[in-house]
Amino acid sequence: PVVGSPSVLHTQAVASSLMDVASGRLLSQENGDKELRIASLTKIMTAIVAIENGKLDEVVTVSPGAAGKEGSSLYLKAGEKIKLVDLLYGLMLRSGNDAATAIAEHVGGSVEGFAYLMNLKAEELGMEHSRFANPSGLDQEGHYSSANDLARLASYALHNDTFRSIVRTKVKTAPNPNEKWEYKWINKNKMLLQYEGADGVKTGYTKKALRCLVSSATRNGQQLVAVTLNDRNDWQDHRRLLDYGFEKYPLETVIKKGETVAGYPFVT
């Protein structure tokens, strides 16, 4: 629900969005419904669909197609066996396209089958400006989303304990059956180190999508999520967006007990 019209904090992004996670209130947006390439922000959808449809302790066998997937990688080997939960950490911390493909094949039966599940979830969440064709976010026709849709998706996913725990993790180790040492994955999301209260969510880049970022932070019991698409100055813009949200819309102003939201009484 949107209470009044969201204001606009200008950024260097082609599109941006800022949302209160608990209420779903849109606090700021610029070109928020513009359909754009989203690179690895796709993996937010991949993760939540896998969490909801798979079993975290199941063992996934990595296919040759997954192991050979181009782009950012965990360097998984064909035939390697790894738990779904560990793949999810590799997916969200290191943006492994091999992990995304292995997850999709395991949970959806195929990349196409998993994309079907992704689009079902998008429809369920009212993501009217989104379409998913693959689990990694590699540039492909018919694969896009919008800043507002991604804010809605991230807010939904952050209500899931498993998802929330993964995306706030700075460093994760996991068993590596092929070597004498463990996998060690360091989260690419610099906001976790640079911004007070930061607790998620995902970076993204392709040559066509350029720099994309979804971040979240919690202060004084209030969690906000910020989205920028095609933004060369994304780290600074996210600090500005989140600062703006916490300062202009502290928790008590986002929703007051008994207040009507979009025509409906809000029950606390």
What is each of the regions a protein language model found here?
Residues 127-128, 139-144, 148-268:
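Domain-terminus/edge residues, biased toward the C-terminal soluble/receptor-binding domains
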Residues 1-161:
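Active-site-adjacent loops and short helices of periplasmic peptidoglycan-processing enzymes
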